[in-house]
């Protein structure tokens, strides 16, 4: 291991993309301000484009002589295939939630965050593992760019619906119940796109439905109603889970919001 001084975010050249600069600024600051090298050992590493910079920043601490001994003992818990690769690519120790069910701190992104730090997650099809890791953590920190912040309710900026992980054989039943009982505007099964025929299959071998409820006034009540439907594994509504959120802006500044 060759040691290098920990790079300061202000010394980095631009990535050439204001959005990526915003994501990096949010992620680096979140790690710098919340990772406790004396108390934290089990670290949750989430999924998504902003979390790339979380893993990168922790990896930079690993290469710094001052922090190496402590960071080398961190065990990082992934939420999916992407985060597993991020952990390994940055030289960090890979663990599992089965081996380490009690997580000290977790970092993850979000598709939308409302004024109460309620979240929509699951656009990347990892919502069950993301919720398992984040709810197992003593501290859950959200990192995102400012497009993901809603000053009012969920469903304002994120227009793709609430991701819902379902048992494959129940897709028709759940789809019907979402539209007829819970009055979703639509509830399509997420498809794999041009590279894959048929539905997206999660890491848990389930399907996903993206249910459009428009603006969500009461995300906790909606989450509970969806969970009661037979065939639903988990929803992408993360309720009273996040402790703090970091939103990177294109000008390089970062807005920090704490749970009220």
Curated annotation (Swiss-Prot):
**A single cellular component GO annotation:** cytoplasm
Q: Which reaction does it catalyse?
A: aldehydo-D-ribose 5-phosphate = D-ribulose 5-phosphate
Where does it reside?
A: Cytoplasm
Q: What class of enzyme is it?
A: isomerase
What metabolic or biological pathway is this protein involved in? Answer: Carbohydrate degradation; pentose phosphate pathway; D-ribose 5-phosphate from D-ribulose 5-phosphate (non-oxidative stage): step 1/1
Main subcellular location of this protein, as a coarse class: cytoplasm
One short Pfam name that applies is Rib_5-P_isom_A
Write down the EC number: 5.3.1.6
A GO MF term: ribose-5-phosphate isomerase activity
Extract the InterPro entries matched here. NagB/RpiA_transferase-like, Ribose5P_isomerase_type_A
Q: Which BP terms from GO are recorded?
A: D-ribose metabolic process; pentose-phosphate shunt, non-oxidative branch; pyridoxine biosynthetic process
Keyword Isomerase set for record: yes
Supply the alphabetized keyword list. Cytoplasm, Isomerase
Q: Which NCBIfam families match?
A: PRK00702.1, rpiA
Q: What does the sequence similarity comment in the record state about its family?
A: Belongs to the ribose 5-phosphate isomerase family.
- What name goes with this protein? Ribose-5-phosphate isomerase
Organism ancestry: Eukaryota, Fungi, Dikarya, Ascomycota, Saccharomycotina
- Could you tell me the gene encoding this protein? RKI1
